[in-house]
Amino acid sequence: MKSLLVLALLAFGAVLVSAHHLEMCEKSTDELREQLVCHRQHATGAFNAKLDQVNRQLRCNNDICTFKKLCDAPDFLTELRKYFTESEINELHELANQCDPDAHHDHPHCHPH
């Protein structure tokens, strides 16, 4: 019974992560740039290094190019999982909550100026 609850919570978490990431895909280039600058400022060194690696893998010169390519995939979360671990995806979700002025979550937000 406990394992079913854990699986249900994990599935619910994946839906929340996916929904927030799709919000990133709907942003204008300027909005996305602002959010990704904030991500870089607040991410761990390991996450920033991984994002640099993914930029190279996708032949992108910047994070905007990378996220636009990831957003162009039919399933954004599946595409993220090709490049990032679940832990890294969770960090990305936390960064999105922190940096997105339009996020509808009860987390503190970063509003870069």
From Swiss-Prot:
Give the signal sequence positions: 1-19
Q: Which GO terms describe its biological process?
A: defense response to fungus; defense response to Gram-positive bacterium; innate immune response; killing of cells of another organism
Q: What is its main location?
A: secreted
Got any disulfides in this one, which pairs?
25-71, 38-99, 60-65
As for subcellular location, the record says: Secreted
Q: Which UniProt keywords apply?
A: Antibiotic, Antimicrobial, Copper, Disulfide bond, Fungicide, Immunity, Innate immunity, Metal-binding, Secreted, Signal
Entry GO CC: extracellular region
Molecular-function GO terms, alphabetical = copper chaperone activity; iron ion binding; metal chelating activity
Quote the function comment for this protein.
Has bacteriostatic activity against Gram-positive bacteria, but not against Gram-negative bacteria. Has fungistatic activity against some but not all fungi. Binds and sequesters copper and iron ions. Copper-chelating activity is crucial for antimicrobial activity against M.luteus.
Q: What protein is this chain from?
A: Antimicrobial peptide microplusin
Q: Supply the source organism's classification.
A: Eukaryota, Metazoa, Ecdysozoa, Arthropoda, Chelicerata
